[in-house]
């Protein structure tokens, strides 16, 4: 592998990898990336499906390979049985275990020292989770996402991390402070890989130098589904397309929305076209009783009995859009190139149902039947089938009321920005300022305001069109 002098910090790592029989293609070299930090580039043309690197599974940094692994798995299995703790997300628990592993290996005499020494301050993403002052994001949906993530991480720290350290007398003094844990969590989350069901989330030396970007992966990890970590099975990093020499080689972020990527990596990926605005707080503030009843009802609604399910609703979307919509189908948000999410549409229909049938007992069978009637109008309207819409004028009337309710929610959501009434177009003009550098936080904030306002304004224009469209020939 070719390296320039300023990247001598990687030399001990490369020697350690060679000692453990890892393979790094001689066509690769490490250099400063135009995206973030360091990256891996090609010195020669690389063919499709060419192996770029192989790392033995026994040397990846994972709770499975760590001397602390047994005590971690025992602690987390016991915590999972506790009535006071409920972490049913496997990736969340896997991340917490990996973060604890990294903290312990980093402050003790570790076999991964050669790798851990490369994770200096230049590797730390400028994640908004670590920003001391977040007032510049006040009113944005992005800030809601950030605060939600912080609450989740703090909850994990209080309920899982501290109890683990304090349970073991020899580890108690090593328990990280909350800020130290959060910093390590941000670093690890930005660099870890899902290996397989046995190893889960892990740090893979060298592989994590490859930068990410949205869209199809240029190269990606491949690992057999096996728990044989004592053998010489290797994890491979393979090119998925032809790569020209002197090009940076990217892994893919996966299919995530812009808010998810920003909180994890600390920059706006221009290739990511999927933005969301969360409408949950506005829905709650507008009518708390409706919202709280919806929270209860949505748990018992059998979506398979609905005319359109979360899966079919997202079938004709792009891969990223479809992935985001299916992962969180019942969340209340507005999304790029689509408008209201599946869950938000159902909530709107539910609210109109409540207004019409205030004194009636809300039977789930009736509610499902009502949803299907409205969905029939919704689909016919979206597909321009005027005859079907006219044939269901009663349903169309309810549909229009739901759309009007959405318009009101959008107006209220825009008022939360507290930005003096600036429009998306005004922010677009500000973004043309040549003095704003790509990595400048001010530019990031302007981009967030622009995309979120643009999404809300377009959604409002769409609702006006839907409610005023003339169906006469």
UniProtKB/Swiss-Prot annotation:
SMART domains reported for this sequence: SET
One Gene Ontology term from the biological process aspect of the record: ribosome biogenesis
Domain SET, chain residue ranges per copy: 26-254
InterPro entries reported for this sequence: SET_dom, SET_dom_sf, SETD3_SETD6_MTase
Gene Ontology terms for molecular function: protein-lysine N-methyltransferase activity
GO cellular component: cytosol; nucleus
Protein name: Uncharacterized protein C16C6.01c
Species this chain originates from: Schizosaccharomyces pombe (strain 972 / ATCC 24843) (Fission yeast)
């Amino acid at each position: 592998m070719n390296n320039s002098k300023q990247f001598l910090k990687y030399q001990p790592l490369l020697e350690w990898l060679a000692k453990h029989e890892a393979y790094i293609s001689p066509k690769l070299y490490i250099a400063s990336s135009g995206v973030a930090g360091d990256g891996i580039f090609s010195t020669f043309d690389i063919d499709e499906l060419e192996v770029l690197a192989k790392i033995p599974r026994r040397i990846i940094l994972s709770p499975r390979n760590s001397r602390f692994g047994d005590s971690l798995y025992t602690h987390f299995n016991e915590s999972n049985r506790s009535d006071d703790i409920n972490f049913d997300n496997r990736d969340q628990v896997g991340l917490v275990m990996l973060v604890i592993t990294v903290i312990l290996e980093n402050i003790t005499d570790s076999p991964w020292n050669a790798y851990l020494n490369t994770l200096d301050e230049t590797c730390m993403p400028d994640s908004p989770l670590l920003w001391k002052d977040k007032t510049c994001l006040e009113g944005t949906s992005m800030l809601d996402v950030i605060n939600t993530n912080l609450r989740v991480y703090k909850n994990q720290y209080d309920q899982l991390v501290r109890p683990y350290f304090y349970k073991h007398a020899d580890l108690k003094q090593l328990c990280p402070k909350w800020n130290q844990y959060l910093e390590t969590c941000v670093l690890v989350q930005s660099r870890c890989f899902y290996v397989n069901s046995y190893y889960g989330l892990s740090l893979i030396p060298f592989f994590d130098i490859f930068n990410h970007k949205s869209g199809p992966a240029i190269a990606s990890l491949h690992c057999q589904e096996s728990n044989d970590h004592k053998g010489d099975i290797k994890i491979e990093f393979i090119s998925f397309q032809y790569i020209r020499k002197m090009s940076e080689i990217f892994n893919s972020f996966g299919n995530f929305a812009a808010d998810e990527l920003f909180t994890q990596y600390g920059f706006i990926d221009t290739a990511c076209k999927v933005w969301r605005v969360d409408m949950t707080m506005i829905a709650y503030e507008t009518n708390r009783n409706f919202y709280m009843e919806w929270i209860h009802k949505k748990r018992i609604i059998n979506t398979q009995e609905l005319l359109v399910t979360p899966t079919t609703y997202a079938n004709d979307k792009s891969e990223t859009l479809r992935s985001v919509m299916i992962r969180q189908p019942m969340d209340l948000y507005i999304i790029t190139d689509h408008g209201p999410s599946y869950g938000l549409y159902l909530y709107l229909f539910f609210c109109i149902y409540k207004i019409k049938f205030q004194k009636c007992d809300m039977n789930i069978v009736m509610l499902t039947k009502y949803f299907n009637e409205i969905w029939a109008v919704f689909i016919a309207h979206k597909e321009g089938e005027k005859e079907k819409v006219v044939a269901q004028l009663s349903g169309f009337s309810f549909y229009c009321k739901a759309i009007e309710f959405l318009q009101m929610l959008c107006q209220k959501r825009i008022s939360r920005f507290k930005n003096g009434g600036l429009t998306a177009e005004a922010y677009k003009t500000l973004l043309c300022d040549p003095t704003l550098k790509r990595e400048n936080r001010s530019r990031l904030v302007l981009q967030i305001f622009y995309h979120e306002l643009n999404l809300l304004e377009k959604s409002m224009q769409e609702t006006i069109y839907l409610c005023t469209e003339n169906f006469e020939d």
